[in-house]
Each structure stands twice: as structure tokens, then as C-alpha cells.
Amino acid sequence: MAKKSMIVRNARQPKYAVRHHNRCKLCGRPHAYIRKFGICRICFRELAYKGELPGVKKASW
């Protein structure tokens, strides 16, 4: 889990745009961030399996 202080700090708008860090909106994870959805890969996987992400379906070939 992300540190509570980092989640709160990231929620505020930074003074300079370069200081912005991509963090998951649900859990605050800084790595494996998917820009299109604004969440990390773990949260993405959970939501996709539940069917809560529109337009996402499991691949099969």
C-alpha cells in the first residue's frame, strides 16, 4: 500500500506541472499505472473481472 502522506500529497494540485506523479486513484500505487483508466494494473484487473470497466473484456485467441 502507498503511504497515506503520499496519497494526500498527490491529491493536491502541485505548484508546478512537472511535480505531478501518476498514482492509482483507488489504492495510491505509483507503479504499473495505466493512463487511460487512471488506475494501477492490479485494480484494473480486479475491476475488469467484475465487469465494472466499460469496453474491457478478457482476450481469447
Swiss-Prot record:
Cofactor(s), names only, from the UniProt record: Zn(2+)
Residues engaged in binding Zn(2+): 24, 27, 40, 43
PROSITE patterns noted in UniProt: RIBOSOMAL_S14
GO cellular component: cytoplasm; small ribosomal subunit
Keyword rRNA-binding belongs to the record: yes
Keyword set, alphabetical order: Metal-binding, Ribonucleoprotein, Ribosomal protein, RNA-binding, rRNA-binding, Zinc
Oligomer and partners: Part of the 30S ribosomal subunit. Contacts proteins S3 and S10.
Protein name according to UniProt: Small ribosomal subunit protein uS14
